[in-house]
Amino acid sequence: MREKIDKRIPRYTSLIMPTFLALKELGGSGKNNEILDQIIKDLQISDEVVDIQHKGRTDKSELSYQADWARTYLSRYGVIENSARGVYTLSSPQL
């Protein structure tokens, strides 16, 4: 059974469009932490929510974990590319 996460944390499905928009705002390319910082800024997510840790881990926040999945789905559908380790780029400049 899946563990429930704090309801204040956006799920990956609701972070897909903000991730895409963050990459556009970053000029079409960004590192994982830059993308996450832009999402936090755009969605005005409080520090309290940002600091909630992913279950069983002390090195990753739940928000970061959910953002990782949003990037994974965008990548699977060809919207973004993992151009280098920890760097994502929009697949087409026209997007």
Tell me the role of every PLM-derived stretch.
Residues R71-T72:
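Short, hydrophobic-biased segments on the C-terminal half of alpha helices
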Residues P93-L95:
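Short, amphipathic alpha-helical interaction segments positioned at domain boundaries
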